[in-house]
Amino acid sequence: MREIVHIQAGQCGNQIGAKFWEIISDEHGIDPTGAYHGDSDLQLERINVYYNEASGGKYVPRAILVDLEPGTMDSVRSGPFGQIFRPDNFVFGQSGAGNNWAKGHYTEGAELVDSVLDVVRKEAESCDCLQGFQLTHSLGGGTGSGMGTLLISKIREEYPDRIMNTYSVVPSPKVSDTVVEPYNATLSVHQLVENTDETYCIDNEALYDICFRTLKLSTPTYGDLNHLVSLTMSGVTTCLRFPGQLNADLRKLAVNMVPFPRLHFFMPGFAPLTSRGSQQYRALTVPELTQQMFDAKNMMAACDPRHGRYLTVAAIFRGRMSMKEVDEQMLNIQNKNSSYFVEWIPNNVKTAVCDIPPRGLKMSATFIGNSTAIQELFKRISEQFTAMFRRKAFLHWYTGEGMDEMEFTEAESNMNDLVSEYQQYQEATADEDAEFDEEQEQEIEDN
């Protein structure tokens, strides 16, 4: 079977990861001790995508938990599903990265990375046919961003032909946890551009907005935000875990979603959004799902897709529904909003359908968009980066760990290149001169 090895790094990564395991354990009928109490064979049919079967019929998540301080790990361990993880798969340091990317990437993290890779190797060896890796982390802190990207590049070296998928929480425009977020995020993006196949950009502010506006929560907690993220993660991986009429795996997704290797930053969305306490009392229809799914208010990254154009889109529907209706609705959206889809990639919307809906819903849809509007997010980080870097503010924390200013300059220009690549394809049309395209291609290759 096509297994996925899951890695969660840093505080944010571990909290999102823990939520993710709660949700998919629930979907597969697995209780907090790892025992199966489900009611359908379908739950077990492809359970080994995410779980190892241990002796006595226990199911153990194929998860590796990494952090540079023990705090978050302890709270995961004492959380609702804390006992389901394999104890050897908790790898943590004592010192913490102190929100410093350099500590995560070069000093503290580099000391711990070999013991993490040993665990990764163990997990990969117990796989029958490893499909790829998924990492949950944030880009604003020290461990998830610095050590997370270090892990990615090390795993890339060892498993070059496996898909590398990340769920990356990007610093928000308004909600900021740390002053040095722009530095950490820019240095991380510099790595992600080169080393991942698919990166889902998730943004706390967008999640807050969804909680306020759609879910009507007056004071959203991180628990609520993480619940939204885990819904998306569960949706993206549905096709791998359950049989469906039209299946997609990580690689198919990458092939359909990434027209140019550097442009692999996606905006996720989910429908129907329901507040945690209130299970909905109305029947959902496919048209409603598609409508809500493409709605700008539904995006989990703080970018407005109406400010750019979609290069590609993937939609994953869950539940019993007519394929014909799904296809009609998707076409309908594309025809009505054709100006928001680039015309030089015909049929750029891929749909997958899985028969099994999430707990408590008749049907749901997960949206993944590769839109040029994501450049807003990178522009925002880049502006904040430049403002601080121009004055060399806070730099001593990084140079003190052995980093060089050059590395900052490189990361900055790589991010700016990314923005201009998105911009270039936003403006490109189908009938421009081919010569112009070749020159551009050449430039991109030279960069």
Swiss-Prot record:
Location(s), subcellular: Cytoplasm, Cytoskeleton
Name used for this protein in its record: Tubulin beta-1 chain
GO MF, one annotated term: metal ion binding
Positions with a binding annotation for Mg(2+): E69
Positions that bind GTP: Q11, E69, S138, G142, T143, G144, N204, N226
Pfam families in UniProt: Tubulin, Tubulin_C
Record key words, sorted: Cytoplasm, Cytoskeleton, GTP-binding, Magnesium, Metal-binding, Microtubule, Nucleotide-binding
SMART domains from the UniProt entry: Tubulin, Tubulin_C
Gene Ontology annotations of biological process type: microtubule-based process
Homology family: Belongs to the tubulin family.
Biological classification of the source: Eukaryota, Metazoa, Ecdysozoa, Arthropoda, Hexapoda
Record field: compositional bias (Acidic residues): 429-447
Major location category of this protein: cytoplasm
GO CC terms in record: cytoplasm; microtubule
Role description: Tubulin is the major constituent of microtubules, a cylinder consisting of laterally associated linear protofilaments composed of alpha- and beta-tubulin heterodimers. Microtubules grow by the addition of GTP-tubulin dimers to the microtubule end, where a stabilizing cap forms. Below the cap, tubulin dimers are in GDP-bound state, owing to GTPase activity of alpha-tubulin.
Cofactor annotation: Mg(2+)
Organism, as annotated: Manduca sexta
Residue segments, region Disordered: 428-447
Subunit details: Dimer of alpha and beta chains. A typical microtubule is a hollow water-filled tube with an outer diameter of 25 nm and an inner diameter of 15 nM. Alpha-beta heterodimers associate head-to-tail to form protofilaments running lengthwise along the microtubule wall with the beta-tubulin subunit facing the microtubule plus end conferring a structural polarity. Microtubules usually have 13 protofilaments but different protofilament numbers can be found in some organisms and specialized cells.
